[in-house]
Amino acid sequence: MTESVLDYMTRLGRAAREASRVIGRASTAQKNRALQAAADALDAARAELAAANELDLAAGRASGLEPALLDRLALTPARIDGMITGLRQVASLPDPVGAIRDMSYRPSGIQVGKMRTPLGVIGIIYESRPNVTIDAASLCLKSGNATILRGGSEAIHSNRAIATCIQRGLAEAGLPAAVVQVVETTDREAVGALISMPEFVDVIVPRGGRGLIERISRDARVPVIKHLDGICHIYVSQHADLDKAWNVAFNAKTYRYGICGAMETLLVDQQVAERFLPEMARRFVEKGVELRGCERTQAIISAKPATEADWHTEYLDAILSIRVVDGLNQAIDHINHYGSHHTDSIISEHQGEARQFMAEVDSASVMLNTPTCFADGFEYGLGAEIGISTDKLHARGPVGLEGLTCEKYVVIGDGQLRGQGSC
């Protein structure tokens, strides 16, 4: 009899839960050995990876997949090199598991502190890019978690081939293959099952378009680590160094249009707008960026009228909204109303103004004189990241190894007894 999707996912979940107990107590050396061996396996399997990837690319071309998506799907030699390097880099990162902090003596004589422990089983749901399989698997493995990976159906052959290499690495280190499992059915029912198994899955991390993430957030019966949009702002204050502001704003928008940390709205203090905007517009127009502005912006530079929808939009493209504001308070109000709580930056040489901005802007990352595109795990010194969270529970900002662990209390005594009057 053919196994149902629910039965299949239950089998994966049960195997992952059992494997999580093994990887959770594995030594740092054993986990690093698995990562290095997986990197070696990827290097040795380049032909297999290319063949599997070509199956996905051929299917994508036949189904009319857009060129940009085909590009994201492709496993070029350089991208395989990047995956190998990524595995080795994660192996070199400090292991957060077992770290104890804040040990202190209480008046009773007991010591109390906190220990980092794995979350358990992490479900990752993502689209298109097969290299996410490596990013997610390596971070979960190093942080002592088992993972169930559900990639996009367009990358099914590539993801299977990559998972096989990772499982070879696990076997070489004496760890169970179920530490990293790829969902091998393209049936969408598998996603519904994965997000509805709290007995087997401890947290879900969705990576993809807004529709996917909204659906997961709405329907999941387990906690979700996510961000919906990257509507990032830069505010150029009246106390800005304009040379610095031109360079920072230009980099924030044009470094890469398609990343969640790209600036989407530029806010400019009215006191500097007439000096700042003409040169800023010249640079953006020369780069091919379409400008959309408020009425005060349009009175200074040539720009299309910005609509209410523009302030809510993550373009992920060469389009920028510009608004002239009365001052710092209006800039903060705009960001907190229209922003996505991702990353926002102020350009200013005034320390008090910068402190107010950082205290009052409700975002996962707040910056001073820094392009928003620096919102990245590697740039923050976290190593690789599994994503960026705009939630306030459990992790906020780039989620690296430590974000894939939690803390439990450690209490050490020497036979102390609690007295009746201490309750």
Swiss-Prot record:
Catalytic activity: L-glutamate 5-semialdehyde + phosphate + NADP(+) = L-glutamyl 5-phosphate + NADPH + H(+)
SUPFAM superfamilies: ALDH-like
InterPro entries tied to this protein: Ald_DH/histidinol_DH (IPR016161), Ald_DH_C (IPR016163), Ald_DH_N (IPR016162), Aldehyde_DH_dom (IPR015590), G-glutamylP_reductase_CS (IPR020593), Glu-5-SA_DH (IPR012134), GPR_dom (IPR000965)
Location(s) in or outside the cell: Cytoplasm
Pathway: Amino-acid biosynthesis; L-proline biosynthesis; L-glutamate 5-semialdehyde from L-glutamate: step 2/2
Known EC number: 1.2.1.41
Annotated Gene Ontology cellular component terms: cytoplasm
One Gene Ontology biological process: L-proline biosynthetic process
Gene Ontology molecular function: any one: NADP binding
PROSITE patterns (alphabetical): PROA
Keyword Amino-acid biosynthesis: yes
Broad EC category: oxidoreductase
Record carries keyword S-adenosyl-L-methionine: no
Keywords: Amino-acid biosynthesis, Cytoplasm, NADP, Oxidoreductase, Proline biosynthesis
Sequence similarity: Belongs to the gamma-glutamyl phosphate reductase family.
Reported function: Catalyzes the NADPH-dependent reduction of L-glutamate 5-phosphate into L-glutamate 5-semialdehyde and phosphate. The product spontaneously undergoes cyclization to form 1-pyrroline-5-carboxylate.
Alphabetized NCBIfam families for the sequence: PRK00197.1, proA
Protein name per the record: Gamma-glutamyl phosphate reductase
Lineage: Bacteria, Pseudomonadati, Pseudomonadota, Gammaproteobacteria, Pseudomonadales
Name of the gene this protein is made from: proA
